[in-house]
Structure formats: structure tokens, C-alpha cells
């Protein structure tokens, strides 16, 4: 009963509901940690990959990518004619740049989860067959250049490192009780 229990859930609301159900059934619910899959994966990376241990959060999370992308898009006006035209439109340019950077950061976050091979392939820049996505590959390459000490610490790269580590190392994981609850579908990296 005193062993820490980690529950991987699809939403914080579901986590709260589970804690209430456990408390109702057992009279108390303590030492229960409900986490989203991405949070669990970051903790897994930190437990197995030494380079991630000093980082509280990923340098590639959407909020950080928003600000980095904003700076890099602004510094590279030749990145995409479409972006240049959009930013030249009416209204507050800085607001438009921020909102665009935020959308791109969220898109990259989804790519890291659902299209990891794209991101791994893009580290060297765009390829001929990418067409309209070539500016995205170029922006990703600029982000990677801007983070030379962390380029191997994005979700797609970390996932490969963890799988390799789990195949070759017998290190015990820090969880004694781990449950997955209410996840009907999961992307490849989860």
C-alpha cells in the first residue's frame, strides 16, 4: 500500500477521477502519480539517458520552440515566400510572427510524436521531394544548428536511444508499480 504508484492517463481529469475512485474503494489514495504519456516518457528518458538529467524540461517543448522559431524566422526572411507574405500582411507584425511561430512549434511537436522519421531526416535540411514542406525542413535544420549541445535530445532521437538502451542494458527502471489507463490509441513514440 505504501509503494509509489504511477498511472499513465490520457488527461488530468481522468487522473483525478482515478484518484477519487481509489480513495473511495480503499478509504485513502496516497502516493499515486497520474501523468500524461509525454511526461512519463520524459521521466523515462531522464532515468536512462544521462544528458537529459540536468534538464527540467525538453529544449524542444512547444513553448520553447515558439520563441526559438520566432527568432529564427525573423532572422531568416528568405526561409519561405509564403511566410514573408503572411508577415507583411496588415496588422501587428510581431503578433503575427508570434502566432505563426506558435503554430509551427505545435506542428513540430506533433511531427516529433507522429512523424519522427521526418524530423530525423530533416536534421540535414530539406530534400528535393519535400516540395512545400522544404521550408519546414530548413527551419528544423536552423533550430538544430541553434541548439548544438541539445540536437540529440528531441523526442524522436531520444526514443531511439531509449529503445537501444533497453535492449542492451539491464538497469532497473525507477517504477515499482506502473499502470496505463484509458489510452485507446497512442502515437508511435508512446
Question: What residue ranges belong to the model's regions?
Answer:
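Flexible, charged surface loops at secondary-structure boundaries
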Residues: 1-3, 167-178
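Conserved RecA-like ASCE P-loop NTPase motor core of nucleic-acid helicases/translocases
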Residues: 2-14, 179, 183
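Basic/charged alpha-beta structural segments of nucleotide/phosphate-handling enzymes
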Residues: 9-173, 188
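Segments forming glycine/polar-rich beta-alpha architectures that bind adenosine-containing cofactors
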Residues: 176-190
Amino acid at each position: 500500500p505504501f509503494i509509489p504508484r504511477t498511472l499513465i492517463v490520457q488527461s488530468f481529469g481522468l487522473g483525478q477521477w482515478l484518484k477519487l475512485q481509489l480513495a473511495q474503494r480503499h478509504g485513502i489514495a496516497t502516493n499515486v502519480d497520474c501523468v500524461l504519456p509525454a511526461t512519463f516518457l520524459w521521466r523515462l528518458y531522464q532515468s536512462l539517458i544521462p544528458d537529459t538529467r540536468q534538464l527540467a524540461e525538453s529544449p524542444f517543448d512547444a513553448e520553447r520552440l515558439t520563441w526559438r522559431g520566432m527568432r529564427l524566422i525573423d532572422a531568416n526572411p528568405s526561409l519561405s515566400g509564403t511566410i514573408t507574405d503572411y508577415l507583411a500582411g496588415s496588422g501587428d507584425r510581431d503578433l503575427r510572427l508570434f502566432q505563426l511561430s506558435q503554430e509551427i512549434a505545435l506542428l513540430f511537436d506533433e511531427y516529433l510524436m507522429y512523424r519522427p522519421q521526418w524530423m530525423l531526416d530533416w536534421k540535414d535540411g530539406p530534400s528535393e521531394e519535400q516540395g512545400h514542406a522544404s521550408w519546414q525542413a530548413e527551419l528544423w535544420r536552423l533550430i538544430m544548428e541553434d541548439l548544438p549541445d541539445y540536437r540529440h535530445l528531441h523526442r524522436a532521437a531520444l526514443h531511439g536511444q531509449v529503445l537501444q538502451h533497453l535492449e542492451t542494458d539491464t538497469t532497473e527502471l525507477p517504477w515499482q508499480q506502473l499502470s496505463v489507463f484509458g489510452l485507446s490509441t497512442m502515437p508511435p513514440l508512446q
